[in-house]
């Protein structure tokens, strides 16, 4: 998949799994419609809503040279009721 980098598993994203919301880091240049198309095509689900925000890159220093890592986008995707993405479902222990 060109637009989606990987799924995110933070405290918030794990909590959102109970609300049928999944969190992904995506390419910065990808549009919402592209990501929606990729998720529906690849996982075989129907997307109800999408929220996105851009996270800033971190500063990096190598000696006197100051640089930074690339910024990236994070999408929170809400699926319609009755759909889920099985490999990303949180296991109950």
Curated annotation (Swiss-Prot):
Entry's Gene Ontology BP terms: translation
Single GO MF descriptor: rRNA binding
GO cellular component, one term: chloroplast
Pfam family, one: Ribosomal_L23
PROSITE patterns: RIBOSOMAL_L23
InterPro entries referenced in this protein's UniProt entry, alphabetically: Nucleotide-bd_a/b_plait_sf (IPR012677), Ribosomal_uL23-like (IPR013025), Ribosomal_uL23/eL15/eS24_sf (IPR012678), Ribosomal_uL23_CS (IPR001014)
Family: Belongs to the universal ribosomal protein uL23 family.
Protein name (Swiss-Prot/TrEMBL): Large ribosomal subunit protein uL23cz/uL23cy
Lineage: Eukaryota, Viridiplantae, Streptophyta, Embryophyta, Tracheophyta
């Amino acid at each position: 998949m060109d637009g989606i980098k990987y799924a995110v598993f933070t405290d918030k994203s794990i909590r959102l799994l109970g609300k049928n919301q999944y969190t992904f880091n995506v390419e910065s240049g990808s549009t919402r419609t592209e990501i929606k198309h990729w998720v529906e095509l690849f996982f075989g689900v129907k997307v109800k809503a999408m929220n996105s925000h851009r996270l800033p890159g971190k500063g990096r220093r190598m000696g006197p040279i100051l640089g930074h890592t690339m910024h990236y986008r994070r999408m929170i995707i809400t699926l319609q009721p009755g759909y889920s993405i099985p490999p990303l479902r949180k296991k109950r222990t």
